């Protein structure tokens, strides 16, 4: 099995590379939940933009691979749903994967009812596209809901924040596994109840019907960097196994930091015995990331890894990047 890496992330001096937009625009109050793909010589950065009224929409920015800190905004690619829909107020946490000639955009919806906390995030929706830029909703209902695991059959809260991996089958077909966040918290003065989240996985043969949901990471009550929640599992394969960077909420900082885990099969994960798996912590006082660092998206660049993430206020200060040598 892989060992926990000693990542030496170097934060980019230009951070945040995608700050909130101009007053009155679709992302003037925040840029959050980055998900980055390389398409040819270009990076596509899908993210959640927050407008002045608090509506969240899926947006797109692009940059040349050779200039990974110089992004150009292209606006909204998926607007919120109708007033009574599960995604009537927020569309957040994009995850984009290509299935043959069709691009799938998975996103987390939040409805307009208030007072439910994490339970108002009632589904992961799907939109499709022929070019990865112009998307159309696949119906008006989520394709994944939060009540699919044996551990939490009455839960409603669910979020994306993960990845999709492809598994080749003996018959020549491809199956898919999605890593995502199970948001089981309920409104409470106890943050361990209010913000409780777990990491989960499911599988699919077509990217539409998902089954086999089960939890793969729980908060660790003895580890103060993640004794409240674990979320946003970004997973990739390496020779010898699987590696994950995920977010933890803990009493040490009160908000998100980032940690890592390793696995032989992508289902059973090793995190070490304490907080030895911490990989990125909040930045120095007064910085755009002094409060939290969260929602990792990792992409390989030759002999290094590039990490995209958001900062204070769940993206109120924008999106930044950091690089590190490939793990030995």
Residue ranges with predicted function:
Residues 297:
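Conserved active-site neighborhood of enzyme catalytic/cofactor-binding cores
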Residues 232:
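Active-site/pore-lining binding-face segments in mid-to-C-terminal subdomains
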Residues 1-89, 97-160, 165-228, 236-291, ...:
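Beta-rich carbohydrate-recognition and catalytic domains
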């Amino acid at each position: 099995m892989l060992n926990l890496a000693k990542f030496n992330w170097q934060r980019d001096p230009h951070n945040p590379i995608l700050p909130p937009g101009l007053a009155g625009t679709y992302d003037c109050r925040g840029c959050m939940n980055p998900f980055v793909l390389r398409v040819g010589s270009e990076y596509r950065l899908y993210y959640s933009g927050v407008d002045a009224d608090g509506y969240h929409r899926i947006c797109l920015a692009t940059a040349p691979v050779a200039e990974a800190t110089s992004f150009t905004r292209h606006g909204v690619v998926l607007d919120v749903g109708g007033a009574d829909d599960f995604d009537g107020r927020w569309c957040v946490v994009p995850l984009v994967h290509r299935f043959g000639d069709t691009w799938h955009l998975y996103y987390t919806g939040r409805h307009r009812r208030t007072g439910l906390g994490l339970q108002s995030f009632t589904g992961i929706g799907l939109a499709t596209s022929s070019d990865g830029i112009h998307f159309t909703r696949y119906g008006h209902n989520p394709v994944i809901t939060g009540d699919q695991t044996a551990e939490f059959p009455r839960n409603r809260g669910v979020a994306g924040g993960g990845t999709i991996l492809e598994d080749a089958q003996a018959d020549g077909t491809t199956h898919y596994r999605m890593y995502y966040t199970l948001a089981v918290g309920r409104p409470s003065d106890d943050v361990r109840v209010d913000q409780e989240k777990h990491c989960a996985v499911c599988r699919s043969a077509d990217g539409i019907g998902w089954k086999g949901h089960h939890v793969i990471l729980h908060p660790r009550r003895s580890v103060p960097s993640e004794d409240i929640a674990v979320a946003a599992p970004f997973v990739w394969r390496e020779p010898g196994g699987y590696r994950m960077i995920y977010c933890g909420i803990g009493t040490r900082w009160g908000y998100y930091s980032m940690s890592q885990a390793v696995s032989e099969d992508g289902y059973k994960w090793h995190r070490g015995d304490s907080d030895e798996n911490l990989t990125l912590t909040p930045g120095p006082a007064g910085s755009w990331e002094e409060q939290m660092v969260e929602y990792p998206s990792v992409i390989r660049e030759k002999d290094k890894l590039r990490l995209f993430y958001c900062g204070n206020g769940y993206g109120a200060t924008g999106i930044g990047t950091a690089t590190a040598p490939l793990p030995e």
